[in-house]
Amino acid sequence: MSKLLVINGSVIPSDKSNSHEMARIFLEEYKKVNPNDEIIELDLNKLVVGTNVLTTETFSTYWGEEEGMKYINQLKDVDKLLVIAPMYNFHVSGMLKNYIDHVALANQTFSYKYATKGASIGLLDKLKVQILATQGAPKGWYPWGDHVAYLKGTWEFMGAKVAEPILLAGVKVEPLSTQSPKEIVSSITSDLIAAAKKF
């Protein structure tokens, strides 16, 4: 039995969210293939780890037991991570960035000790990650705003094995912008099911 952690990095209500619809299809198939796995869900909208911003005022407590360390230990305890990640202003949501700021901590999730010059060692090397991402613009419109590359690179930096991310792009441009989340996501259902079976 494996433990799967699901992180919701979307600010959109689930019934109106393309990324939530992607996650719904993915998890439905995942549960069929892995009926005994434990699934833990984190809604960053409702947690301090999603809303607490790193500033000079919060720096001394940011990685304390109730903040960063709690979630770092959770990542070390689970086997798999599903990240729900829409794009906002060319990046992940502020909540997801806050979460990553809490868990990307030297000597906990990565280390420079014993690394070769200019390199690091990721400490989450038993973690497998699947990224489900959406963005309003078609892929490639804004190459400098690649939130999927940021997420993939960050989790790999921390040692995780990242499965091929699934990006649903162009959701704010016609014809997709005129459709419901179910209609939009139906175009990649087979990709989601295939990824869930392998995860």
Swiss-Prot record:
Homodimer. Keywords: Flavoprotein, FMN, NAD, Oxidoreductase. It is an enzyme of class 1 (oxidoreductase). Its cofactor is FMN. Binds 1 FMN per subunit. It comes from the Bacteria. One of its GO terms (molecular function) is oxidoreductase activity, acting on NAD(P)H, quinone or similar compound as acceptor. Pfam families: Flavodoxin_2 (PF02525). Quinone reductase that provides resistance to thiol-specific stress caused by electrophilic quinones. Also exhibits azoreductase activity. Catalyzes the reductive cleavage of the azo bond in aromatic azo compounds to the corresponding amines. This is FMN-dependent NADH:quinone oxidoreductase 1. FMN binds at S10, S17, N18, S19, M87, Y88, N89, F90. It catalyses: 2 a quinone + NADH + H(+) = 2 a 1,4-benzosemiquinone + NAD(+); N,N-dimethyl-1,4-phenylenediamine + anthranilate + 2 NAD(+) = 2-(4-dimethylaminophenyl)diazenylbenzoate + 2 NADH + 2 H(+). Transmembrane segments: none annotated. The gene is azoR1. Its EC number is 1.6.5.-, 1.7.1.17.
